[in-house]
Curated annotation (Swiss-Prot):
<keyword id="KW-0224">Dipeptidase</keyword>
<feature type="active site" description="Charge relay system">
    <location>
        <position position="162"/>
    </location>
</feature>
<dbReference type="GO" id="GO:0016805">
    <property type="term" value="F:dipeptidase activity"/>
</dbReference>
<dbReference type="InterPro" id="IPR005320">
    <property type="entry name" value="Peptidase_S51"/>
</dbReference>
<keyword id="KW-0645">Protease</keyword>
<keyword id="KW-0378">Hydrolase</keyword>
<feature type="active site" description="Charge relay system">
    <location>
        <position position="125"/>
    </location>
</feature>
<feature type="active site" description="Charge relay system">
    <location>
        <position position="140"/>
    </location>
</feature>
<comment type="similarity">
    <text>Belongs to the peptidase S51 family.</text>
</comment>
<dbReference type="GO" id="GO:0006508">
    <property type="term" value="P:proteolysis"/>
</dbReference>
<keyword id="KW-0720">Serine protease</keyword>
<dbReference type="GO" id="GO:0005737">
    <property type="term" value="C:cytoplasm"/>
</dbReference>
<keyword id="KW-0963">Cytoplasm</keyword>
<dbReference type="GO" id="GO:0008236">
    <property type="term" value="F:serine-type peptidase activity"/>
</dbReference>
<comment type="function">
    <text>Hydrolyzes dipeptides containing N-terminal aspartate residues.</text>
</comment>
<protein>
    <recommendedName>
        <fullName>Probable alpha-aspartyl dipeptidase</fullName>
        <ecNumber>3.4.13.21</ecNumber>
    </recommendedName>
</protein>
<dbReference type="InterPro" id="IPR029062">
    <property type="entry name" value="Class_I_gatase-like"/>
</dbReference>
Length: 240
């Protein structure tokens, strides 16, 4: 059965020179309007202050015509998800977010609603990490201990949000981002998409495309790498 996926996976909510979510406004509007979304259910669990975080997202989306409600305010979270028009899983600490989703038993309902019923899903940073098969390629400190690194698996590959290129001439002797991602590939034999700031992945059913004005870097399962230009067809990454 074909997937009903309707996803927008952002590298980040903030981009230098832009207001909160401003760089992704057109992408968000396209996604929400395609599904006639008027109210977005925000999942704030990647940060500690859920009320403040939800208010930040509300302040960004309301002027564009979208209401925002916080999942944390709902007495029955699973029912709220089932009644939602769209969900937005915000960034922050990926380990904290995933542990919260496990503790609240929300992984299975989200997975079902997104993959089988086509519930629009927006992820940013940590929210993008948990949308992938696992959180192994997050940049975050493991300040919390989820039961597993396995995540929602809305897409069958890994993403590294906030991807940074190695700095030419750097005197830093620690591992580069590339070396860490290459290590993951060596152990797991799975591809990782490095999303630079301002880029995102749009998934509609069995098709995916790279959005934004910068390249993404693909770390291939065989150990090679490839630069992918804006509007590149990423559908091949959806093949399990």
């Amino acid at each position: 059965m074909a997937s009903a996926r309707n996803l927008l996976l952002l590298s980040s909510s903030r981009l230098h020179g832009h207001g909160y979510l401003e760089h992704a406004r057109g992408q968000l509007e396209d996604l929400f309007k395609s599904a006639n979304v008027k109210t977005v259910l925000f999942v704030p669990y990647a940060l500690r202050d859920h009320d403040k975080y939800t208010a930040t997202v509300r302040d960004a989306l309301q002027p564009w015509g979208f209401n925002v409600e916080g999942l944390h305010t709902k007495p029955d979270r699973e029912q709220a998800l089932r009644e939602a028009q769209a969900i937005f899983v915000g960034g922050g600490n990926t380990f904290v977010l995933l542990r919260s989703l496990y503790e609240m038993k929300l992984l299975d309902p989200i997975r079902e609603l997104v993959l089988q019923r086509g519930l629009p899903y927006v992820g940013s940073s940590a929210g993008t990490n948990v949308a992938t098969r696992s959180i192994h390629t997050t940049n975050d400190m493991p300040v919390a201990y989820p039961p597993s690194f396995e995540a929602l698996a809305l897409v069958p590959f890994n993403i590294n949000p906030h991807y940074l290129d190695p700095e030419a001439g750097s005197r830093h002797k620690g591992e580069t981002r590339d070396e860490r991602l290459e290590e993951f590939v060596a152990y797991h034999g799975l591809p990782v998409l490095g999303l630079r700031e301002g880029t995102s992945v749009r998934v509609q059913g069995e098709k995916a495309i790279l959005l934004g004005d910068r390249n993404a870097k693909l770390f291939k399962a065989d150990g090679g790498t490839e630069e992918l230009a804006p509007l590149a067809d990423l559908t091949f990454l959806l093949q399990k």
